[in-house]
Amino acid sequence: MQASRLGWSSYGDTQYVAHVLRYYPYGRAFTAGGNQAIVEVALTQVGNQGGQPYWSWYGFDSRVEWCACFVSWCADQCGYIESGLVPKFAGCVDGANWFKSHNQWHDRNYEPKAGDIIFFDWGGDGITDHVGIVEKCENGTVYTVEGNSGDACKQRTYAVGSSSIYGYGIPAY
């Protein structure tokens, strides 16, 4: 065998997989595309405290309200910002307005799909003030992954049509 003549115990790079995967976000290739990819990225971030990777990626030098930075960061990891599927936004109002202006918007009574962007109105004043990513919707319950939920990335649940839901941005995956 050529390998043993050259003094090798095997052919090729024994660390090939690790060396290739370093070029993928989080060291792994996505198992799904489209709307599921952003959910997979978001789920890898559950437990992050303080949001530093997201607001610093966006360009801020110090901590800001970072829920929108988190959503944008997740979208960027999937190539969705570069491809124009999801806007890069640091303010919830800007993100909601982008989806509305592109006719990719549904109100709170819509039954969302995985990968939809969920906007909230905690104050009940008709202005969105928080945003997350829909993980799934089952039996009238919306499951989300949100950044800056108590200053951490967390999974949360809401009833479809909840008064705290402002609406949904629907990326054209």
Please identify what each model-predicted range represents.
Residues 1, 20, 41-46, 72, ...:
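Short, functionally critical alpha-helical segments immediately adjacent to catalytic or ligand/cofactor-binding
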Residues 1-40, 162-173:
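Non-catalytic cell-wall polysaccharide-engagement segments
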Residues 2-10, 48-52, 80-81, 127:
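Secretory-pathway/luminal and periplasmic proteins that interact with or process carbohydrate-rich
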Residues 7-11, 55-65, 105-109:
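A glycine-rich, coil/turn loop motif that links secondary-structure elements
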Residues 14-17, 64, 68, 112:
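Short alpha-helical patches at coil-to-helix transitions and adjacent helical residues
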Residues 28-83:
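N-terminal capping segments
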Residues 81-151:
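...with weaker cross-activation on analogous glycine-rich loops/strands in unrelated enzymes
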Residues 139-173:
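Active-site signature of cysteine proteases
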